[in-house]
Amino acid sequence: MVKPRIVSKRVKSVLIIGSIGVLVLIIAYVSLLGNNSAPTTISRYPSASLVANSKQDAVKKYQLQFCGTDSKTNANEYVQEYKLPQHCEMPLAVYAEGNGNNIWYISTKNGALGAFDSKSGNFEKEKLIPIWKSRSEPIDSSQVWDMKSDKNGDLWFTDEKQNAIWRYFKSSQKFEMYKVPENSSSFGTTYPVSVDFDNNGNVYFVGIRSPALWIGNLSKLRNGTSEGLSKIPIPVSGFRGIEPDLISTGSLALDKKNGVIWISMLAFNTKGQIIRYDLKDKNFKTYDMPPELSSPVGIAIDNESNPWITDHGTSLFFKLDHSTGNITKYSTSKASARIFGSNSSSAPQGAYTLPYWIKSDSNGILWFNEHTGNKIAKFDPATQTLTEYWIPTQDNRWGQCIDPRVPCGIANALQFSVGQGNNNVWFSEWSENKIGMINASRASPISVSAFPAELTLRRGQSTDIKVQVKAVSDTEVNMLSSSSLTRNGDLGNSTGSFSQDKFNLKAGDSKEVSYIFTASSNLKPGQYVLMVGADTSPLTVLKAIRINII
């Protein structure tokens, strides 16, 4: 992970992505000097600098990096990708409407609203958003992180560079823009990032650069103005001592049943808070996160009104119990060696998957994207089962490749939407000029069970966990484990090993293996979660086991 370098006052940030705030995971700087002979440097996560000696070269390199000029559509058993109709769309927000047949997306480069008919496989003619400054800038875009539909079926989306939120009326095919009535003196925008609605249809949103909850009164909103917008300052006293420019608002989610708004706040990799706002009492309640959860971003509400949050500085996601304030941490599988082009069975030490945004489907299943894990995951709170879908695209321009001759990198699947009819998941590939679909109704090739589901150990004590894998179809199985013991899913000083790491199963067969876990002698007493399961290459299935250390 890298921090932005301040190159000069004439250097403009054209990409702020990955982590929320000034500390980011992917940064690109492009010099916009008038002198063509002046060098231009583009630095990005994770490694190399691209040097251009002319504006023409700068544009070419920018397009190669961010426009998916040479990308191809890929597929596996669960994922199908679709190339967008225009050049260099740089899609972020995507929205699966109603039953998931009509898929909306925003071109952050071209400033256009597009739609894809998943039944016919055809793209509709894109609709230009009236005001979009980056459309005329060859190396710029305006990030649109969120798009949702209101109760009337109209689309709302956030807009970074115009410092606004937009509404698209489908009946009249007209756009309206509502300007945020303030901006950041350091960044020139509040950077609207997340939007939601209450039961009355009023709109609520937050901006990365604004510690405030913004409210839009539908009856008072006026196109092209700030009328009807008001704000409620979010208390940030808990971030005292941290430079204000490093304090960011992550996202918000409404618990409509209880009239509560949940908001994530962070100083990336320094401090995290989850904030509860009661719409009736107009009171804030703040929950300080432990040090290992210092980058909370995405929030979704489960069927029991508990917020689930993704931490975009680790490989962890977690539940905050709304009644007790207790936190239960879970880990994704550890980062795949495939991301690094490694022939070994494990990724380099310290690799993170960076869970980003999280959403719930009509069955109460939680979905989230693993930014640098190159997966879309779903977690069933009822069965404590995590299923991860591998995205078949890898771009080595976005990877720390050990061997560039081997496929490596990630697809930059930065946002997604869950179709409420069929629960298929649609996601955008921001640097690849594509959208993709996960067929969530297709059966997994394996099922995993583990016993016991919860256990209590003393430090230094070992236990034998039985893990059973049953095959629905012929498959090769690789056993996996991870945990909430560390930020990246490793076991830390604890150890764990399977009696057999790899085997083949025929359809209908099952196999039980032992997993011997030994808690380290210096492990801090408390509750942890161990994830055990299997990988089949396109799909991973893990079961969560609670471990109480006494």
Pin down the residues of each PLM region.
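Beta-strand-rich domains and repeat architectures in extracellular enzymes and scaffolds
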Residues: 50-63, 80-111
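Beta-propeller fold detector
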Residues: 62-64, 80-83, 124-131, 176-182, ...
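Beta-rich, blade/repeat-based domains predominating
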Residues: 87-99, 132-151, 183-199, 237-257, ...
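Conserved beta-strand positions in repeat-built beta-propeller and related beta-rich domains
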Residues: 103-110, 140, 157-161, 203-210, ...
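A short loop-to-beta-strand structural motif that recurs across blades of beta-propeller domains
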Residues: 112-115, 164-167, 211-217, 272-275, ...
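Short loop/turn segments that connect beta-strands within beta-propeller blades
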Residues: 117-121, 169-173, 217-224, 277-282, ...
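Blade-level signature of beta-propeller repeat domains, shared across WD40, Kelch, NHL, RCC1
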Residues: 404-445
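Long beta-sheet-rich domains in secretory-pathway and surface-associated proteins
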Residues: 442-550
